[in-house]
């Protein structure tokens, strides 16, 4: 599993080469004046669901442990004025901040895991209180201890004012559809909070080293593959049936699931060994309980995503501080989207789900 040091190196690499369509990278001191987005002459908010960061209070908690390197916060993951300036230049009004949960899932010391998450959640909440008109944040949780994770997200939401939870796609190789994790899912559903999943290179399903070499395939293939597997497990193992009010957001446009959903839709009909636990058609979950960000990078990719999932299930995402092409103008220029659809995708859906006023 990549540690925080490798993550920081990747952030630094992203900052070194800016894609032309993106604008200033995170960490630059000052960007252009704030870009404001309007549709049909009406100002609309833009909310970014896919915004990586770290918080400094974690470092002293992990100092002297095997996880000390994961406590480093540097470069574009730092929460500072440069981040706000870059948001301004890119037309982003709000970021929904998240910290990768999988940095800590290998910790077996329950007390240490709890103290790390408390430091993260309190650090995120403090930043959001300082900038309530620009940031909300997903709560972190110690998913390796599902009962603790449930308590942590409740504390994050009720005491700290955080919105939902950010998780990885598995816990040390164990599928999150396993009933062991039901206390976490039950709490998220009870609270009515969105759970945002970010993958980590499909290490749970790919042979070690298989995605090495050229092309950064661990990211390019592995991340969407892990997301596809994660969502498929939630569908076919009945998680969405056990928790019918649960809503799950998936990074990287929902992985490959929407791209080849016809195969998923008929699996329980044509495969006698599928042993499906779901009680509804897979598409019903796709169009009601699953959300995906806009990171498809093309007009046709967005058209297909909306056709499969519906505009109410699509939300804007950038993957900052990594310098992927921005998709804001793809949404704005999409001839197949109504003004209402564009407004919903860019911010309306998340304003509602994350209770942004």
Short names for language-model regions:
Residues 2-45, 49, 55-94, 122-130, ...:
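Mid-to-C-terminal alpha-helical segments outside catalytic/metal-binding sites
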Residues 39-40, 189, 242, 284, ...:
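Short, flexible hinge/linker loops that cap or flank conserved catalytic cores
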Residues 43, 52-78, 107-108, 114, ...:
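Active-site gating loops and adjacent loop-to-helix segments of metal-dependent hydrolytic enzymes
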Residues 47-51, 95-97, 137-139, 165-167, ...:
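Hydrophobic faces of well-ordered beta-strands that scaffold small-molecule active sites
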Residues 73-77, 105, 143-149, 172-179, ...:
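Acidic-and-aromatic substrate-binding clefts and catalytic sites of carbohydrate-active enzymes
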Residues 93-238:
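Active-site gating/metal-coordination segments in enzymes
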Residues 132-137, 161-163, 244, 284-288, ...:
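Short, surface-exposed connector motifs at secondary-structure boundaries
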């Amino acid at each position: 599993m990549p540690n925080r040091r490798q993550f920081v190196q990747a952030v630094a690499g992203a900052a070194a080469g800016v894609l032309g369509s993106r604008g200033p990278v995170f960490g630059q001191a000052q960007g252009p004046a704030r870009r404001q987005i309007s549709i049909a002459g009406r100002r609309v908010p833009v909310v970014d669901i896919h915004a990586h960061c770290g918080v400094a209070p974690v470092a002293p908690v992990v100092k002297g442990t095997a996880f000390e390197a994961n406590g480093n916060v540097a470069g574009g993951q730092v929460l500072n004025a440069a981040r706000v300036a870059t948001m301004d230049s890119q037309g982003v009004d709000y970021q929904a901040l998240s910290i990768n949960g999988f940095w800590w899932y290998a910790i077996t010391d329950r007390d240490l895991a709890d103290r790390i998450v408390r430091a993260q959640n309190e650090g995120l909440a403090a930043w959001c209180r300082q900038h309530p008109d620009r940031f909300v944040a997903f709560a972190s949780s110690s998913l390796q201890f599902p009962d603790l994770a449930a308590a942590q997200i409740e504390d994050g939401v009720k005491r700290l004012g955080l919105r939902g939870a950010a998780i990885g796609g598995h816990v040390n190789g164990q599928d999150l559809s396993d009933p062991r994790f039901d206390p976490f899912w039950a709490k998220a559903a009870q609270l009515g909070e969105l759970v945002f999943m970010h993958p980590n290179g499909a290490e749970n399903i790919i042979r070690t080293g298989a995605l090495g070499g050229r092309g950064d395939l661990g990211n390019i293939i592995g991340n969407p593959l892990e997301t596809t597997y994660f969502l498929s497990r939630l569908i076919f193992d009945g998680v969405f049936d056990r928790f019918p009010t649960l809503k799950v957001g998936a990074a990287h446009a929902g992985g490959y699931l929407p791209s080849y959903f016809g195969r998923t839709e008929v699996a329980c009909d044509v495969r006698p060994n599928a042993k499906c636990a779901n009680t509804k058609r897979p598409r019903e979950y796709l169009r009601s309980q699953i959300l995906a960000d806009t990171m498809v990078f093309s007009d046709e990719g967005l058209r297909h995503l909306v056709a499969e999932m519906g505009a109410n299930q699509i939300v804007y995402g950038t993957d900052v501080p990594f310098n992927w092409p921005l998709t804001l103008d793809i949404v704005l220029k999409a001839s197949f989207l109504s003004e209402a659809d564009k407004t919903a995708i860019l911010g309306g859906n998340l304003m509602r789900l994350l209770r942004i006023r």
